[in-house]
Amino acid sequence: MNRITIIGGGNIGLSLARGLVKAAYCDASSITITRRNLSSLEEEKKDGFNVSDQNPEAISDADYIVLAILPQQIRKVMDEIAPTLRADQTIISVASGVSCADIKEVLGQDKVVIRAMPNTAIAIGQSMTCISTDQADQEKIDEVSKMFESVGSVVVINEDLMTSATALCACGIAFFLRGIRAASQGGVEIGFHAHDALKMAIQTAKGAADLLLQMGSHPESEIDKVTSPKGCTIAGLNEMEHNGFSSAFIKGIKLSAKKAGGLYND
């Protein structure tokens, strides 16, 4: 069984570790999680995970090393682990805006590097994860894809689209959550109690997403089914569009993509 070291015990790192075990991809004993403050990993230790505050030691027997840290912190961590790395270890980076070339510049050109961009729905096994690489072979790509498929869906993309994937999938989950919040606030405006309005908005959003996933249909074809001539749905949609709904959404995604591309150098 492959051994995995996850450097960074934050939300993404811990969710990945727990998701892999829950999906029976591997045992907790096969995973080591590192964090500077070990007291925050007490629960994981009790659940059978290996924990450490020493990154070089933690990666010594790992087959896969996941860099689950902020882009602003990754250079320091790479400098720390570079002397310990072996050529047969695979590096998986989930840091936004840090290219395979950036990583190899520090860790060595002989290293196998694969980038992955999950989102916070990884905590419930529903992440949308995009994967890319520069030169990793198909076997490695398939293995990393299998790893992340245990915690959601996976799409393999070209590396030059990874900052775009960050905006659409990682930042995107916040955009959709803000839309749900706005819908619930609208529900309160028209007479519902806040908790009822939120429940209704959440389930409606879930139903809309499941319709597209299960029917394989396009959003507009499903919209057409609920818009009748002179009806209330088309009136509401047109009011939103007149106030820039789609335009604001698109502009937000584009700006997030631009920002994501510069995080490593900020």
Segments predicted by a language model, with ranges:
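Internal alpha-helical scaffold of NAD(P)-dependent oxidoreductase catalytic cores
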Residues: 102, 106-112, 128-164, 175-216, ...
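Small-residue helix-packing motif on alpha-helices
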Residues: 31, 58, 74, 193-201, ...
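Glycine/serine-rich anion-binding loops at beta->alpha junctions
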Residues: 117-122, 167-176
